[in-house]
Amino acid sequence: ISIMLEEIGYDYKITKIDLDKGEQFKSDFKKISPFSKIPVIIDQKNNKTIFESGAILIYLAEQSGKFYDINNRLEINQWLMAQMGYVGPMLGQHHQFHHYNPGKSQFGEDRYFKISKKIYDNLDERLSNSKYLSGEDYTIADIGTFPWIARHKWHDIGLINYVNLTRWYKDISKREAVIKGFSIMNEKETIPKP
């Protein structure tokens, strides 16, 4: 979400929620995020609270008029929903079994490695036909998907083996707003090279 906020040039303030301390389960946070998940934004100007990253991206795109072309919304929504319902959850499970808890479940590691490889295959195939996920223009579908592929070293799949996905990744990695938004929570963190 920080990438989107940087892309549209909105002023914002970050409130860090310490997941290791369980701050996301406190009653005040549950009032704004019923599933105790991050991210959440509070739009002070419009007195709105929005949870779930896909909903936040759509909201910010509609408010700013950027990265969500009305003439391409069906395509954008399909690729954004693919990220929300498949790419993010499956790569997230891969992170849990392969990166955070290796050796705890061979079944889990094998299953999510195969699914993650399939995701890379699918994205690479899609990007063989278009510059970005939903066509020739950079959209919220790319903004939502990019941070998951930016963890490619955790996946041990070899991003560099996917020509089109690597081209897309490098292209997005050069955007000033992406560079700034990616490291906003940790200034020492930089976008990994392919």
Residue ranges of predicted features:
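Short, solvent-exposed turn/loop segments enriched in Gly/Ser/Thr/Pro and often Arg
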Residues: 18, 140, 185-188
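Phosphate-coordinating loops and pocket residues in cytosolic domains that bind phosphorylated ligands
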Residues: 31, 174, 183-184
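Alpha-helix/helix-capping structural signal
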Residues: 55, 176-177
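Active-site-flanking alpha-helical
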Residues: 61, 148-149, 182
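GST-like fold's C-terminal all-alpha helical module
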Residues: 86-176
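Terminal-tail/helix-coil boundary detector
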Residues: 179-194
